[in-house]
C-alpha cells in the first residue's frame, strides 16, 4: 500500500522524498493548480510564498544549527537549496524559481513517487499518511481533521513583501552593500530623516485590504509583522527594526541617512529584488502609490505586491514522533503542526518521513534528544497546549540550558547540540 502524503509544499515534498529514498511507494497529493491559495502564484511543488531566505548560515544561530542538523540527517530539500543558492551574506538565500523547479524535478522523476493533482477532503483511517497541507488549509479537509482529532484550529495572520524588477530602480538613489561585512548582496535605498517620517506617515494613513478580518494586533505573527503594524508601535520603530542603517558603509553622497529600505536578490540573475522585512497588508493601489513617491522607485515595476493571508494550524495533536494521538498511521508535518519557518517545515517533513518508514518497516520509533535543535522543536510541538495561538520557530530557548561561564555557554550549547544530533543520526541509520 502506498503512503499518502497530502500537500506538496516544503514539508510534503521532503516527506515524500525521504520515504521514496527508503524504498516506500508514495502518492503525493497537491491540490494546485485546480485549487489555488491566496498566497501561491504557481502550481510548483515547494513554492516559497514569502521570503526566499531559508535562514542563517551562522553556526551559533538557531536556524544555522537546525540547518546543520538537517544536513546531518540527510534532508533532500536542504541539499537542493544549496544547489539553488544565490548571494545572501550569512543566510541561505535561494533562487525562488530554481529551487521549486529542482524540487519538482526530484519528486516527479523519482520512481517511487506518484504525484496526483487533486484536492483531498478526507483520509481513510487505515491508510498510512503524512498530513502536510500547510497553514492555508481550509474547507472540508480542515473540518474533517478537526473532527477526527478533537481539536479546534488556531488562527493567525502572515504577510508577504513586494518584489521589483531591478532594472527599474534608479541607482542614483541606492547602493549595494551588506551589514557588518564585505560583499554586496543587498541593495540599500537610504532615506533622510524627513523622507523617513513622511514614509511612516504614509504607512499609518494608508488604506488596508480587508482590515476588518484582522483588526486585533495579537492576530499577527510577531516575527512577520506588517510594516504598518510596526509603524503603529512608534515613529522610530521601523528605523530601529527592518529599516535600521546600522552596520552599513554608506557612500558619502548620501547625507542625513536615518533609515534604509533593503532589497535582496530573488533569483540568481538578480533581475528581481524582494524588499526585506517589508511584509504589508496595505492595498495594492496604495503600495504602488507610496513607494513610487520615493526617488529610487519612481519608475519601479512591481512583479509582486505585499499581501496578508490567514494561516491555520492544529495545536496539540501530535506526539514526539509527529504521529497523531488518535491514529497511529497518521503523521503530521509542516506549519499545520504549529511550527513556523521554511527550515522548520522541511524538518517536520523529514522527521515524519523517517518515522513512517520505521513504523511500516517494523522498527522502533526513536525519539530525538532534546539537546538538539530539532529535538527541542519537536518536544515543544508535542507539549503544545490546545490554547496556543502562535506558531513556533527554532530558538535556543527550546533546548535545555547549559552550565558554565556566560562567555562559554553559547559554544557549549552548539557543541552539545551537534553531538546529540550526530548520535541520533547513527541511531536512526541516517549516517551517509
Curated annotation (Swiss-Prot):
Catalytic activity, as annotated: uridine(54) in tRNA + (6R)-5,10-methylene-5,6,7,8-tetrahydrofolate + NADH + H(+) = 5-methyluridine(54) in tRNA + (6S)-5,6,7,8-tetrahydrofolate + NAD(+); uridine(54) in tRNA + (6R)-5,10-methylene-5,6,7,8-tetrahydrofolate + NADPH + H(+) = 5-methyluridine(54) in tRNA + (6S)-5,6,7,8-tetrahydrofolate + NADP(+)
Any GO molecular function: flavin adenine dinucleotide binding
Keywords in alphabetical order: Cytoplasm, FAD, Flavoprotein, Methyltransferase, NAD, NADP, Transferase, tRNA processing
Domain of life: Bacteria
Biological-process GO terms, alphabetical: tRNA methylation; tRNA wobble uridine modification
Positions that bind FAD: 7-12
SUPFAM superfamilies, A to Z: FAD/NAD(P)-binding domain
EC numbers on record: 2.1.1.74
Localization: Cytoplasm
Cofactor(s) recorded in Swiss-Prot or TrEMBL: FAD
Enzyme class: transferase
GO cellular component: cytosol
NCBIfam families reported in the protein's UniProt record: gid_trmFO, PRK05335.1
Role: Catalyzes the folate-dependent formation of 5-methyl-uridine at position 54 (M-5-U54) in all tRNAs.
PANTHER family: GLUCOSE INHIBITED DIVISION PROTEIN A, METHYLENETETRAHYDROFOLATE--TRNA-(URACIL-5-)-METHYLTRANSFERASE TRMFO
Family matches, as HAMAP family: TrmFO
Family named by the database record: Belongs to the MnmG family. TrmFO subfamily.
Protein name: Methylenetetrahydrofolate--tRNA-(uracil-5-)-methyltransferase TrmFO
Species the sequence originates in: Coprothermobacter proteolyticus (strain ATCC 35245 / DSM 5265 / OCM 4 / BT)
Gene: trmFO
Amino acid at each position: 500500500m502506498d503512503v499518502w502524503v497530502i500537500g506538496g509544499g516544503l514539508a510534503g515534498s521532503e516527506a515524500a522524498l525521504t520515504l521514496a529514498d527508503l524504498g516506500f511507494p508514495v502518492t503525493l497529493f497537491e491540490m494546485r493548480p485546480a485549487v489555488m491559495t491566496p498566497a501561491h502564484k504557481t502550481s510548483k511543488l515547494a513554492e516559497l510564498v514569502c521570503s526566499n531566505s531559508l535562514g542563517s548560515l551562522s553556526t551559533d544561530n538557531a536556524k544555522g544549527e537546525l540547518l546543520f542538523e538537517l544536513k546531518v540527517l540527510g534532508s533532500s530539500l536542504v541539499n537542493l537549496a544549496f544547489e539553488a543558492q544565490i548571494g545572501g551574506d550569512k543566510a541561505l538565500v535561494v533562487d525562488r524559481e530554481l529551487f521549486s523547479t529542482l524540487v519538482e524535478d526530484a519528486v516527479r522523476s523519482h520512481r517511487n513517487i506518484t504525484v496526483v493533482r487533486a484536492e483531498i477532503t478526507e483520509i481513510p483511517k487505515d491508510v498510512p499518511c503524512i498530513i502536510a497541507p500547510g497553514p492555508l488549509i481550509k474547507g472540508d479537509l480542515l473540518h474533517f481533521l478537526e473532527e477526527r482529532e478533537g481539536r479546534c484550529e488556531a488562527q493567525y495572520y502572515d504577510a508577504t513583501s513586494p518584489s521589483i524588477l531591478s532594472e527599474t530602480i534608479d541607482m542614483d538613489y541606492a547602493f549595494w552593500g551588506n551589514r557588518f561585512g564585505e560583499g554586496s548582496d543587498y541593495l540599500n535605498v537610504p532615506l533622510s530623516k524627513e523622507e523617513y517620517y513622511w514614509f511612516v506617515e504614509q504607512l499609518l494613513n494608508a488604506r488596508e485590504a480587508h482590515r476588518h478580518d484582522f483588526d486585533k494586533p495579537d492576530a499577527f505573527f510577531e516575527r512577520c509583522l506588517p510594516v504598518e503594524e510596526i509603524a503603529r508601535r512608534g515613529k522610530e520603530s521601523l528605523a530601529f527594526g527592518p529599516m535600521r542603517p546600522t552596520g552599513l558603509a554608506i557612500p558619502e553622497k548620501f547625507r542625513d541617512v536615518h533609515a534604509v529600505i533593503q532589497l535582496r536578490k530573488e533569483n540568481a540573475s538578480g533581475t528581481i529584488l524582494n524588499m526585506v522585512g517589508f511584509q504589508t497588508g496595505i492595498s495594492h493601489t496604495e503600495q504602488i502609490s507610496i513607494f513610487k513617491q520615493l526617488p529610487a522607485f519612481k519608475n519601479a515595476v512591481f512583479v509582486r505586491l505585499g499581501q496578508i493571508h490567514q494561516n491555520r494550524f492544529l495545536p496539540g495533536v501530535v506526539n514526539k514522533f509527529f504521529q497523531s494521538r488518535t491514529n497511529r498511521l497518521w503523521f503530521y508535518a509542516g506549519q499545520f503542526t504549529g511550527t513556523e519557518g521554511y527550515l522548520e517545515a522541511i524538518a517536520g517533513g523529514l522527521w515524519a518521513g523517517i518515522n513512517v518508514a520505521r513504523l511500516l518497516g517494523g522498527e522502533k520509533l526513536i525519539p530525538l534528544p532534546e539537546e538538539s535543535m530539532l529535538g527541542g522543536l519537536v518536544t515543544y510541538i508535542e507539549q503544545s497546549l490546545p490554547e496556543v495561538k502562535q506558531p513556533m520557530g527554532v530558538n535556543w530557548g527550546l533546548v535545555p540550558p547549559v552550565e558554565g561561564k556566560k562567555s562559554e555557554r553559547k559554544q557549549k550549547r552548539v557543541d552539545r547540540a551537534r553531538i546529540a544530533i550526530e548520535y541520533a543520526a547513527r541511531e536512526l541509520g541516517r549516517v551517509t
